[in-house]
Amino acid sequence: MKNTTTSIDHQQMQRIKWLTYMMFMMFAMTTDAVGVIIPEIITAFDLSLTAASAFHYVPMIAIALSGLLLGYLADKLGRKTTIILGLVVFSVTSFLFAVGNSFWFFLSLMVCSGCAIGFFKTGALALIGDISSSGNEHTTTMNTVEGFFGVGAIIGPAIVSYLLASGFAWKYLYVIAGILCASLCLLAWKTNYPAMKKEQSEDITLKRTLKMMKNRYALGFSSAIALYVITEVAIYVWMPTLLRDYQGDMIWLATYALTIFFVFRALGRFLGAWVLSKFNWMQVMFATSLAIFCCYLFSMIYGIDAAVYLLPLSGLFMSMIYPTLNSKGISCFKKSEHGAVAGVILFFTAVAAALGPLAMGAVSDLFGDVKYGFYLATGFAGILFLMMAYNLLQKPTQ
């Protein structure tokens, strides 16, 4: 018996899509603003760089564990229940930032918000499969969803900068996110979601999710996504440090390099739907991964004068890789397994986002310059390209 979903009208379908878009934008506002927040907490709590970096890797680890250990609940409890529970926890956690004044209190809230994100994100990713009638539509929707994530990544740091310039604390970003999240929760509660039918014999448990870690398709896509995430996070965590000593004629470009990277990434994801309608997704992944590798390689060969141009430009080529691989990885499985496989992929995503920058930092400290961390990232970009070349030539999913 095949998995199906009950039909809902076009208006409800559009409402579900926009709710999903806004959810991804909302949590990107907080997760991708951490780079602007860390200097503030270093000053406020007299922290070392290692201690302050916990604001980045601790919630990422929480997202990873939540996705892996709780992702199957999106299949067991249903998408709507999972999404609403996650949004409620995230909203309450966000409001609690307003009453806190200690580093450990804030870090505890980051753990809670990470768990909530992992919970409702797996539900939202599984929901995309429910509302998609084909693999191409799934990939198109996923690119649009990640486009809104890219918009949130631009809005979040801008809000923090505005709050600080206006004399307000960074923590009120979370209050703003909490208000938006509470509104989304109410709208999600009032929205009719497609009801999924599954085989009566299916046993939806954590054991099934852990077993999926051995599936070659889940493992293959997750590994490729992890490699991509390491190369992407390298940009928004360490590129400002790499370009800090730039003394050329394009000082303004070095100053706004990270913003330009985020803009390219967001625009590319919105364009992804059109590009993927014209070309085979495996060809697109091969070409974009090659372009990313070249951006890294030539930045390392020709130094900071080339990196100031090439690393921000890489955002355009990175834009389509994550949503496309995520979509193809999830849609390989039955709809009743989408929550579990989304949790597995999210686990690899968040672990890579947490450990990648740490590995780069360790290598940079060992050799005394941040460029050595980028040599490591270049290696990961090269491996990603080789995987996409193998995918194009051997077509293992067909």
Annotate the PLM regions:
Residues 15-49, 121, 125, 235-240, ...:
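Extracytoplasmic
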Residues 34-35, 216-259, 266:
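Extracytoplasmic gate region of multi-pass secondary transporters
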Residues 41-42, 73-74, 159-168, 243-244, ...:
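Interfacial helix-cap and linker-helix signal at transmembrane-aqueous boundaries
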Residues 57-71, 259-271:
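Central cavity-lining transmembrane alpha-helices of secondary-active solute carriers
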Residues 65-104:
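Conserved MFS/SLC helix-loop-helix module at the cytosolic interface between two early adjacent transmembrane helices
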Residues 109-148:
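Cytoplasmic helix-loop-helix junction between adjacent transmembrane helices
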Residues 144-192:
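Helix-loop-helix hairpin linking two adjacent transmembrane segments in secondary transporters
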Residues 332-369:
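A late C-terminal transmembrane helix in Major Facilitator Superfamily
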